[in-house]
Amino acid sequence: MPRSAILVIDAQIGPMGGAYEGSSVIKAINKTISKVRESSGVVVLIQHCHSSYEPLMKGNTGWGLHPDLDKSPEALVVEKESSDSFYETPLDDLMAENDVEHVYITGI
């Protein structure tokens, strides 16, 4: 049966640090995550991992997902090294494996 998915892109400490009304943005993202989960949808958290830009280098504080973001245990996490969430990531395969037909996109 086709499912929906929400892609939460770059909702990380680094990019969110200076975001205008960042806490309101996270609350809105969490509300949408909850609705997708209630309909048995797939939650995908996408993290930017930069090899030379220190705030987003894997393991650095800025790389971590925002502390207020709903990071439920069943959420799938995809790491990306470019601005394109599908380029050289398993995202396309994850969408197919989970029979995703409708995609909602949010993030920073």
Predicted ranges, named:
Residues 73-108:
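Internal catalytic-core helix/loop-beta-alpha segment
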